[in-house]
Regions:
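Glycine-rich, proline-tolerant flexible connector loops at the mouths of alpha/beta enzymes
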Residues: 1-11
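A short alpha/beta connector and helix-capping loop motif
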Residues: 52-55, 133, 147-179
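Active-site acidic/histidine proton-transfer and metal-coordination neighborhood
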Residues: 11-137
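A short acidic (Asp/Glu
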Residues: 3-4, 44-46, 123-125, 148-152
């Protein structure tokens, strides 16, 4: 991305070399790398400027995987669905699905969504519903699930057809400092 090259122009060559080396190491050691863009990356937003900035942020993060020469199955960008804003879950899911095609092909293939830790937020059933509409990976964050038990176990049913992206499953576990 042009803005990333501008920000880091003085060390761009060095960054490129380091990332290529990191990617080579990850492949040789079968390490799957992931990033977790921040809470302001909201593809389900109803605000055009937030969506535009979210797309830029996701493209910026996907640049790391690309510069490491990693295939999407070896690099993941994990975000929350978000974007409820007093509306319905379905409206947010529709907005996310509408904005998703504006991402580059590589960014789309690297992106995954996870359940949230907020009461009345998007739970794993909502992320699975999104995966019925668009080809996106879903992550169950056990920390968020355990904190709020927002989803009753019997409600979590994997039904329908999902895209098999030949991606190794990944556990996303958060451990707090008091454990």
């Amino acid at each position: 991305l042009d803005f990333a090259q501008e920000w880091y122009k003085e060390i761009w060559e060095e960054i490129t070399e380091i990332l290529l080396e990191a990617g080579k190491y990850a492949k040789q050691n079968e390490v799957r790398l992931s990033v977790h863009p921040g809470q302001y990356t909201v593809l389900a937003s109803d605000k055009p400027n937030v969506v535009e900035n979210s797309i830029k942020d996701l493209e910026y993060h996907s640049l790391y995987g690309s510069m490491m020469n990693l295939l999407p199955e070896d690099f993941s960008m994990n975000i929350h669905l978000q974007g409820l804003y007093g509306g319905t879950h379905d409206a947010g899911i529709k907005r996310f699905a509408t904005h998703f095609p504006y991402l580059s092909d590589y960014a789309q293939k690297c992106l995954s969504v996870e359940n949230e830790d907020k009461p009345n937020g998007y739970d794993i059933t909502h992320t699975l519903e999104l995966a019925q509409r668009i080809p996106i990976r879903c992550t169950l964050d056990t920390h968020h699930y355990d904190c709020h038990r927002m989803v009753e176990t019997e409600r979590v049913k994997v039904e329908g057809k999902y895209v098999n992206r030949k991606v190794r499953e990944v556990d996303h576990i958060t451990v707090t400092s008091d454990l």
